[in-house]
Amino acid sequence: MNNLDAIYVDVDDFCLLFEPQWLEHLISTGEKQRIKPSRLSSSEVMTILIAFHQSGYRDFKTYYTKFVCQYWRHYFPDLVSYTRMLKLLQATLPALCSYLKQRFDKPTGIAFIDSTSLKVCHNMRIPRHQVFADEAKRGKGTMGWFYGFKLHLIMNDEGGLLAVKVTAGNVDDRKPVLDMVRNVTGSLYADKGYVSTSLKAELAEQGIDFITGQRSNMKRQPISSWDRAMLSKRFIIETVFDQLKNICLLYTSPSPRDPT
């Protein structure tokens, strides 16, 4: 599978540079971590996970036990049990986050920011949810109330990722903006949910022109035809959200169960 080979080569090249630096960081900060030897390398674990989001499988367990273990053993001869694989996925999280950051695109002078909800369970099951009980929060999006997290993205006009951040569901969309604009230049476009005079002023100090939609109860501000056209182009980020949720299976839509 050429695509799998390409993923592995790119990830493995990254891990060869990342792992010594990460180990040095842990030593310098005094963080104690018990690194248990594994038959699978970090690059193999990351490759399997990245390929999962391109596989079309609805859940990782079926993908790993019914597909990877049965059909990819010649690619990964030292496969571990599913339970052990889950532990390895947790251990490779720092490397995955760093790899994602390495894949960020370059700014083009035009950027868009938006957020989407990541539901962890149906609203009827909130009182019984335990997995993310300490992290997930109730929030409200365009589709109503939800329980979980928010995914915030900044993208350029070519669809390249510039910044990403995950927050609890009750965090205001405007709060993480200043932490996300380090790789942004020129104009940043957002919907009317991001309207904030103070935020616009702070971004202007960093050389970023922050342009948002206007709320119905606002005094109308003049806006150029170019900026109006760019605001209408924000659908590009909605397209990415749709791909992440429905093709890459960023999360599976929680379905209601019998509340009794």
Write out the residue ranges for each language-model feature:
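Major-groove recognition helix of helix-turn-helix-like DNA-binding domains
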Residues: 76-91
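Active-site proximal helix-loop segment of RNase H-like, two-metal nucleases, encompassing DDE(D)
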Residues: 225, 232, 242-250
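Short gly/pro/ser/thr-enriched loop/turn and capping motifs at secondary-structure boundaries
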Residues: 217-220
